[in-house]
Amino acid sequence: LDAGRLSWNEPLQLSKTVVGGGAGWMASKPLGTRFPTHEVATEMIRVSDNTATNLLIERLGGQETLNARFNALGLSATKVNDWLPDLKGTNSTSARDLARSIALVDTGEALSIRSRDLFREVMGTSITNTLLPRGLLRGLGGRQGEPDDSLMVKGYRVLNKTGDIGIAYADAGLIELPDGSRAVAAFLVKGPFNDPRSTELIRKLAAAMAPVLKPKPAVARSSASAASIDP
């Protein structure tokens, strides 16, 4: 987008190559259906649409091109070797790479301010909040309810993206704190197929980091000012 080689409303066409099973709804549409890039990017994050992810992989030059770009960004553990859903687990990444990719965007090292804002908007659409957000809420204590709303009441916001292939679960996100500062967290757990202990471990790890994300109380500032008047 920043280089002008892709527009946010450019249509991407559904082909047999990119249709992926599993999560998402785009695979159910007829071949030849065209989706604007902004919808594809949003659905990739919002509902983890595998076909949407494949559409973007194809449009951005394919697996080898993306892998070279990941390597140039210092994401050495991240490699795309197969189209999604990749149930065999041939694609790879690390918690460090997940955290670094978010940090690169948030610090402005990888994207312009406008593209960074688009990134945040899209990340904010993710509907899965049962791992990192739920764990953080648990660690903060107090009222426990729906994670996003309950965190917002406490002054926190988590822009996160989850992923799983049954034997591995991940959640990474940008955490906005009550004092305006931000933090990045990423978790990646491998375990037995569909083992609930994997997701619970992510929640426990997120809860354990909560104490260090509690900002120091702000010093109250008086709005009153004193003035002397000569008689």
Where are these regions (language model features)?
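A mature extracytoplasmic/lumenal domain signature
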Residues: L12, K16-V18, L84, F187-V189, ...
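Flexible glycine/proline-enriched surface loops and loop-helix/loop-strand junctions
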Residues: P36-V40, V47-T53, N81-D86, K154-R157, ...
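Mid-domain, small-residue-enriched loop/turn segments at the edges of structured enzyme/sensor domains
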Residues: P36, N54-I113
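Active-site SXXK
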Residues: L1-L14, M44, A185
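Short, mixed-charge aromatic SLiMs
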Residues: K16-S28, A72, E121-P133
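Structured C-terminal helix/loop/strand segments within mature extracytoplasmic catalytic/sensor domains
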Residues: R5, R59, L104-P231
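Conserved catalytic neighborhood of penicillin-recognizing serine enzymes
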Residues: T17-L55, Q63
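Short alpha-helical scaffolding segments that buttress acidic/His motifs in well-ordered protein cores
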Residues: V40-I45, L56, F70, I102, ...
